[in-house]
UniProtKB/Swiss-Prot annotation:
Keywords: Amino-acid biosynthesis, Aromatic amino acid biosynthesis, Decarboxylase, Lyase, Tryptophan biosynthesis
Catalyzed reactions per annotation: 1-(2-carboxyphenylamino)-1-deoxy-D-ribulose 5-phosphate + H(+) = (1S,2R)-1-C-(indol-3-yl)glycerol 3-phosphate + CO2 + H2O
Name this protein carries in UniProt: Indole-3-glycerol phosphate synthase
EC number: 4.1.1.48
Species in which this protein is naturally found: Burkholderia pseudomallei (strain 1710b)
GO molecular function: indole-3-glycerol-phosphate synthase activity; phosphoribosylanthranilate isomerase activity
Length: 261
């Protein structure tokens, strides 16, 4: 299979160049300064303190590998359902070309509930970090496979200066070594290889011994059943980012509760 990640990054750079023309930095800074902030990391820790799994529930219409996951897609309704059934935070896809996401979806989901929201996208430039704050995100995703370490460190520092939490995502030990140079406590292990889109939850289990105890491990992708959840919890993983299993269910929030609570 061709390298999907490289294709996505190329498109992102084209999108940034176009966005700079339509929404200059100064305009975004004004929008960003008007946004309130919700404590993303704190919401996860509160769930842990209460003895519960911390679920980052994803609002995702489609993916490159699976196509459309949910035809009746109303972000506000999905967000409310997640909040009512015990989610700690939301993750909203804002990539349009590959995941049929939108900044509007993030705004709609955040307005519908009180949960902190992660902007799920392929961030390669500081402009996108500011853009995330302007659209109302409380956290951003930094993907180690898409960034060199100095840039990742710079983007994290900029995000923190704007009041954004950072989830750094890795898929292998080499990426983990670089990700641990960041300050964020949130380390996501993506069970899906972004270059091939092959998925196995053994990816998370095989990397746990290399992660310091002061980091919060977030297992991402491939968590599709209660059995998957129990396997992770038995290994000491209590923070999950889940999208597909919920999106395919008739009631996303009820499926969250069934799998986790």
């Amino acid at each position: 299979m061709s390298d999907i990640l490289d294709k996505i990054i190329t498109v992102k750079r084209e999108e940034i160049a176009a966005a700079l023309e339509s929404a200059p930095l100064e305009e975004l800074k004004v929008q960003a300064s008007a946004r309130d902030s919700r404590d993303f990391v704190g919401a996860l820790r509160d769930k842990h303190a209460a003895g519960h799994a911390a679920v980052i529930a994803e609002v995702k219409k489609a993916s490159p590998s699976k196509g459309v996951l949910r035809k009746h897609f109303v972000p506000a309704d999905i967000a409310r359902s997640y909040a009512q059934h015990g989610a700690a935070c939301l993750s909203v896809l804002t990539d349009e070309r590959f995941f049929q996401g939108s900044a509007r979806y993030l705004e709609q989901a955040r307005a519908a509930c009180a949960l902190p929201v992660l902007r799920k996208d392929f961030i390669v430039d500081a402009y996108q970090v500011l853009e995330a704050r302007a659209m109302g995100a409380d956290a951003i995703l930094l993907i180690a496979a898409a960034l060199d370490t100095p840039l990742m460190i710079d983007l994290e520092a900029y995000a923190h200066s704007l009041g954004l939490a950072v989830l750094v995502e890795v898929h292998n030990r080499g990426e983990l070594d670089e990700a641990l140079k960041l300050k964020t406590p949130l380390v996501g292990i993506n069970n899906r290889n972004l270059r091939t889109f092959e998925t196995t939850i053994d990816t998370t289990l095989g990397m746990l011994d290399a992660i310091p105890d002061d980091r919060i491990v977030v297992t991402e992708s491939g968590i599709l059943s209660r059995a998957d959840v129990e396997r992770m919890e038995a290994a000491g993983v209590h923070t999950f980012l889940v999208g597909e299993a919920f999106m395919r269910a008739e009631n996303p929030g009820a499926e969250l509760a069934r799998m986790f609570f």
